[in-house]
């Protein structure tokens, strides 16, 4: 789950404070293990 941690750190905490927990998990599941899944799916 290193990708998840890296993506959470890359995402601005101000914008995605709550979305990091739910949004990134959903985007990882939907988009796969892409390093840009948060950016692409959000």
From Swiss-Prot:
UniProt-recorded name of the protein: Lanthionine-containing peptide SapB precursor RamS
Stimuli inducing this protein: The RamS precursor protein (detected by an anti-propeptide antibody and by a C-terminal His-tag) is detected from at least 16 hours post-germination on both rich and minimal media and is detected for at least 52 hours (at protein level). The mature lanthionine-containing peptide SapB is expressed by 3 days growth on rich medium, expression increases slightly over 7 days (at protein level). Expression requires ramR, not expressed in minimal medium (at protein level).
Cross-link Lanthionine (Ser-Cys) per UniProt, renumbered positions: 24-31, 34-41
GO CC aspect terms: extracellular region; plasma membrane; spore wall
Processing and modification events after translation: Maturation involves the enzymatic conversion of Ser into dehydrated AA and the formation of thioether bonds with cysteine, probably by RamC. This is followed by membrane translocation and cleavage of the modified precursor. The RamS precursor protein (detected by an anti-propeptide antibody and by a C-terminal His-tag) is detected from at least 16 hours post-germination; its apparent molecular weight decreases starting from about 34 hours, when its probable modifying enzyme ramC is transcribed.
Coiled-coil intervals, chain numbering: none
Keyword Iron attributed: no
Phenotype on disruption: Single deletion of ramS leads to a severe delay in aerial hyphae growth. Deletion of the ramC-ramS-ramA-ramB operon on rich medium leads to an initially bald (no aerial hyphae) phenotype; after 4 days develops a substantial aerial mycelium. Wild-type mycelium on minimal medium. No expression of SapB, normal expression of chaplins. A complete chaplin-negative plus ram-negative strain (deletion of ramR or the ramC-ramS-ramA-ramB operon) leads to the complete loss of robust aerial hyphae.
UniProt source species: Streptomyces coelicolor (strain ATCC BAA-471 / A3(2) / M145)
Propeptide feature: residues: 1-21
Modified-residue entries (2,3-didehydroalanine (Ser)), positions: 27, 37
Record lineage: Bacteria, Bacillati, Actinomycetota, Actinomycetes, Kitasatosporales
Alphabetized UniProt keyword annotations: Cell membrane, Membrane, Secreted, Thioether bond
Protein family according to the UniProt entry: Belongs to the lanthionine-containing morphogen family.
Pfam families: RamS
Annotated stretches, region: Disordered: 1-21
């Amino acid at each position: 789950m290193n990708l998840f941690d890296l993506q959470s750190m890359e995402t601005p905490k101000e914008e995605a404070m709550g979305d990091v927990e739910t949004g990134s998990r959903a985007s990882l599941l939907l988009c796969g293990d892409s390093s840009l899944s948060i950016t692409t799916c959000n």
